[in-house]
Amino acid sequence: MKQPFLISFFVLLCSTGIWAQSNPTTPFMPAPKANFEKIGVNTPNQAAPPLFAGSLEEALTHAFDSIVALSPIKGFTAAVLMPDGNVWKKASGVSQELPSSLPLTTDHLMGMGSISKSFVSVTLLKMVDAGLLSLDDKISKYLDPYPNINGEATVRQVLSHRTGFNDYINENPAMNAALVQNLDSIWEIDTLLSHYVLAPNFPLNTDWSYSNTNFLLAGRLIEKISGKTWYEAVREQVLTPLGLTHTFAYPFETPGAQPFAHCFSDQDGDNVVDDLQGVGIPDEGLFSLATSAGCFITTPEDLVRFSERVHGGHVLNASTLAAMQTDFAQNPSTGLAYGLGAMQYTTLGIENWGHNGSLIYNSNAFYFPTENMAIAVQQNDERLWSPTAQIVDGDIVFLSLIVAYLDYKQATATYENNLDVQTIISPNPAQGQFNLLSSGLEQDEVEVSVVNALGATVVRQQFPVVNQQLNAQIDLSTQASGVYYVQVRDAQKVRVVQKVMLCK
């Protein structure tokens, strides 16, 4: 068996500064990758089957098939909950390669990573609704002391990552070393809190820092108040009432006969991802170490139903949901706002609420209030988009589905079969100006717009198309460093959405 080394858990460590936080001594970023931060997508693509514009479901299927055809990722699953309550869902790829290759289906479970935090937060907030505790209670009211944990922290500060507590996973190398030596162990929350949390990064409520440790504490609060294990309480308060029959706190709960997709990770540094369960690497240690901060497994269909029920106002009291969505810390450079166990983004100008997460598997699940629509995408492969490895990952699939949904809604939108638009942006990252080259365009003129992470359009220009080719120079020299999205639109619809990073 290959010697495993586990490189990443929930939190994406971002060297580009996109997620930079104000405390320079704690350069650890919220995990969960942003659902709009890795966009480098040309849609639709010739590899896709023809699109029939007769239904939204066909439009989504075309977008999904178009983009996953370009990806080396082993498997994707996706779901969209429509305003009428119907769910579109699709899968592509393999669920395992060893001992034999099997196709991935929409019934396969995958780890949701830090989306688990939203389930835990909602459970605790329902207890607030029931009068069992207050958001402004100090955690020392319910919990025994732990090393490096200030009992003066409030429930509100815990759920919104304003405690400054050290992240036991991403900021303590001893945790990773202990995990590698105990891959088949079942970790307990008290063990993790007692032995693997280092000194705080900053005093209470003076800054913001994403820390998985906060949601170990949230799990223990649930246990102390309910008298049940945290996952029993989540099932009783959230999973069962919402009919989420494909979601489990693994390995504390097991999925029975429901299929669990294998995860793929490069464990020996040869640039080839391995089927971890297929080669015999235990997963119990990793998932139990994540515990109430990230151990749930699920399907995209359960994720979209959860997202719509919670953020659509059907689970929590109005005042509690308002606190969840308005009591947040915000990063103005990225558009991220983190509330009480929930993230808020503005994606292509549209507000959405939810969470994302990574535990080798990668997941996004967000609800769009103005559309009354939810989207979830999961992948069973650790590989992500980066400036040096521009692969199609779950973030890009997620954005492709948003674009397909919005385009379908536009009264003037029409779809063409066998459209082949290829786009190159160079240099990328750019220092101020970049060249945009698109071929395969069929109109005589196109509009190029550049949108920042907050959804604001910073450039909008018309360019001629000569011999089906656009060759344009775009100037962002007056803009701040960050992530931008380039859209190429003709008279009918958006033809290209691609990400460019500006690094001055």
Q: Each predicted region: which residue ranges?
A:
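Catalytic loop of the DD-peptidase/beta-lactamase superfamily, centered on the K-T-G motif
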Residues: 21-91, 223-226, 235-236, 278-423
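Short hydrophobic alpha-helix segments
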Residues: 90-92, 378, 461-462, 498
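Short active-site loop at a secondary-structure junction
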Residues: 70-77, 99-157, 202-213, 291, ...
